Regions:
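DNA major-groove recognition helix of helix-turn-helix/homeodomain DNA-binding modules
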Residues: 45-60
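Amphipathic alpha-helical segments of tetratricopeptide repeats
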Residues: 95-102, 135-143, 174-185, 219-230, ...
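Helix-turn-helix repeat elements of alpha-solenoid scaffolds
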Residues: 83-97, 122-137, 166-179, 210-219, ...
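Residue register of alpha-helical TPR repeats
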Residues: 73, 112, 151, 189, ...
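A short, Lys/Arg-rich alpha-helix, primarily the initiator
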Residues: 1-14
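Short alpha-helical DNA-recognition segment
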Residues: 15-34
Length: 287
């Protein structure tokens, strides 16, 4: 019942419908209010009529796997690549075009754009407080079951780490790990999100000079990538081990990690990281 009430209320607000407008010609406004408070279970016939007005299938209210087609699909694909490359200039350019172009957006799509804006604010304009506040507000208004919640929480965690709020970062990291334990990793977005969280944590451990723990975290995440047959974040994880390994591993071992990462960058056409790896190899050979 809680799922029905929450999804019903969120979808109505997403479409900017008042309770009265939604109820008009179908039922009493008081019934809409009771549904949203979880005090009334509508009949199948009533729910069907309301679902038509809300433009969703009937299963939407009960099945958390049901997704409504996004109007930002192309933008999301492009922005994902730009975020991986840390190309915030092009990300901002595409964001501005999308904001001007988009008219009707679902709540999740609007929240996605807010999430992107917080990243642009943080990295492009050094508006760290505003970006953090924006993400904190996002987390208050969307369900923790949604993909955008996980993205926003992970980004907020990174921001906390970068501004020195270590306790907040570690609390968020623990929360993220708990949430991901409930997700189905057959869903690529959940798998990639989980890998990102673990990579970020390994990077955080490096910043704290906990190199052994960082290597262990990276190795475990690499094993996950192999189990799931994905190369996502594999090159950065190998580079991280190589960088940490200068403290503990032999020169040839470190070199092998860099070379493996370099080959992946060539295969998947990642010139920015490839350039970094070539520099690491030159520095290593000069030692």
């Amino acid at each position: 019942m809680n799922t029905l009430a929450e999804k019903f209320r969120l979808k109505r607000k997403e479409l900017r419908l008042s309770q009265q407008t939604l109820a008009e010609g179908i039922c009493e406004q008081s019934q809409i209010s009771k549904i949203e408070r979880g005090h009334f279970i509508p009949s199948a016939d009533l729910l069907f009529k309301l679902s038509q007005r809300l433009e969703v299938p009937l299963d939407y209210f009960f099945n958390e796997q049901i997704e409504i087609k996004s109007n930002l699909s192309n933008f999301k694909q492009l922005s994902a690549r730009l975020l991986d490359d840390r190309n915030y200039d092009n990300l901002e350019y595409l964001y501005k075009i999308e904001v001007e172009r988009s008219t009707f957006l679902t709540l999740e799509d609007r929240t996605y754009l807010e999430w992107i804006k917080s990243i642009i604010d943080f990295y492009q304009y050094d508006s760290k407080c505003e970006a953090i506040s924006s993400l904190e507000n996002i987390l208050l208004k969307v369900s923790s079951n949604t993909l955008i919640y996980l993205k926003a929480l992970n980004t907020l965690s990174n921001f906390y780490s970068l501004v020195g709020l270590e306790q907040e970062y570690e609390a968020n990291y623990s929360h993220l790990m708990e949430l991901y334990q409930t997700k189905n990793f057959e869903h690529q977005e959940f798998l990639f999100g989980y890998i990102r969280v673990r990579y970020n944590y390994a990077h955080y451990l490096v910043s704290k000079e906990k190199y052994n723990e960082a290597i262990q975290e990276a190795l475990e995440t690499i094993e996950l990538c192999k189990e799931r047959q994905t190369s996502y974040q594999l090159a950065p994880l190998l580079v991280l081990i190589g960088n940490c390994g200068t403290q503990f591993l032999g020169k040839e071992q470190v070199k092998n990690y860099y070379i493996e990462a370099r080959e992946l960058c060539k295969i998947y056409n990642n010139p920015l990281m490839l350039m970094k790896i070539e520099n690491y190899l030159k520095e290593l050979d000069a030692v």
